[in-house]
Structures are given as C-alpha cells and as structure tokens.
Amino acid sequence: MSEGLVRFGVEDGIAVITMDDPEHRNALSLTMRRGLRDALERFNTDPACQVGILTASGSQVFCAGGDLKEMAEHQIGVPERTFVPILNRNLWIDKPIIAAVNGIAFGGGFLLAMMCDLAVAADHARFAMPEAKWSRGAPWSIPLHSMMSQRVWMELALTGDPIDAQRAYEIGFVNRVVTPDVLLSNTMALARRIRDNAPLTVRATRQMIYMAAEMGRTAAWDVADHLFEAVYRSEDALEGPRAFREKRAPQWKGR
C-alpha cells in the first residue's frame, strides 16, 4: 500500500516502511514526517505486525535529514517536540523495529537509524550529524550516550563529519554491514528470527534493555522482575517448554 511519500507493506508478520521521495533525498519535509508518523502508528496498532523494518527506496539515500529549504521558507526556529517522530520520546512503540540503511543517513536520517532497535547498513552507507555546520541542534542524540563512547559521540557532534558503514559498525551504531544487493533480504532474515520468538518475551526484553540504560542496576533488576511476571504467567510460558518436550515449533498466542 502506498501512502504519499511513505509506503507501508506487511509480509508474514513483518511490516516494511519505505521512505519514497528520492528526488528530494527523502528529506524530512512536513509531508514525509506525517507519513512516517502514520506508518509507525499503524505498525504499532496492527496485530498482524510483529516486527518492523524502516528503509528507503533506491540505493543512494536513506534520509538526508531535515528539509532545510522548507525550514528557511517557513522560518522554523525551535522545533516542536513532535517535529519528527522519535520512538520512545514522542511516539511509543512496543514492537521491535530494524533500520535497513541503504545510503546516506545525515541529520534526521541519523536520528531515524538511531531510534530503531537494530540497524543493518549497506556497505556504502554514510552517517553524519551535520547540525553544527548549519547552526541547528541535535538534542535528539541523547540516546547515543548508551550506544557509543562519549568521545566518539563528541567527535561526531562537534565536527559534523560523516563516518562510513564500517566505522558505524566498529562503534556499535549498526549491527551488520552487508552489500547493497542483500540489504533488504538480510534485514528480513533478521526480522524473521525475532518474529519467530515468543512475542511477550521479545517485547518485555526490549523494554527492559531500554530501562536498563536509564536506571541504576538494582532499580533495573526490580523493574525487570515486574516486567517478566506477565510473561511467566502467560499461556506462551507453558507452550514454550511443551513444544520443546514434544520436539516441535512453538505456536505462540501472545498471551
């Protein structure tokens, strides 16, 4: 299904959200931002979707960032907190989503890759936070404190210089680097591995990992215990060991 500048499709429980404005390098115009928010909300509320993939059409640009021409035309000063959909900040998603970065991811494109739970990058992809070059800001980059070292983050933010996919992998920003021809298939394979696991455990684990980045160890342990109570009491918690005993694939119900 096509919705403006953002396409949305579902295949075997995996939603693929595709930015599709290559003429404007998938810049985050108002139309693109609205399309992304709508697609992400649809992914979160559709019970048929277990895992999401965020990518872009073409092979050169994932997202070049904010639409600076639009910003200049409308004299955008301080962006509203909801200016760009940011997962776990102004848009709450409880399902895992993977970025399939097919090219340049600058500024807001860097943000989109960062906000996903996992990232797979084509080997020619490049990442940058160029806000310092244009007197903009990157308050959205706060989650990087738990993704990379302070000095790596500092260099990216203060210089605005791009890094290649291999460097992004070395600093822990992306999980895998692959050739462009297998980017989507590799990302789909990763998504299927997650999809096939117990959905309640996947979602609770995802939430636990994010909370651990914000809390002290003891507090995080207590919250994690509470999170997994619902998992342990679920029908799926009985189905897993039963399937293991019967030597068959589990049939998850998500309850």
Over which residues does each language-model region extend?
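C-terminal alpha-helix plus adjacent terminal tail
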Residues: 1-12, 47, 160-166, 185, ...
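Glycine- (often His-adjacent) and acidic-residue-rich active-site loop
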Residues: 5, 56-92, 133, 215-216
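Short, active-site-adjacent cap segments at secondary-structure transitions
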Residues: 59-63, 106, 209
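Hydrophobic alpha-helical segments typical of transmembrane helices
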Residues: 82-87, 140-143, 152, 204, ...
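Conserved CoA-thioester-binding segment of acyl-CoA-metabolizing enzymes
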Residues: 1-55, 59, 185
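Terminal peptide-recognition signature
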Residues: 17, 21, 35-36, 54, ...
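Crotonase-fold acyl-CoA enzyme core
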Residues: 91-200, 233-234, 238-242, 248
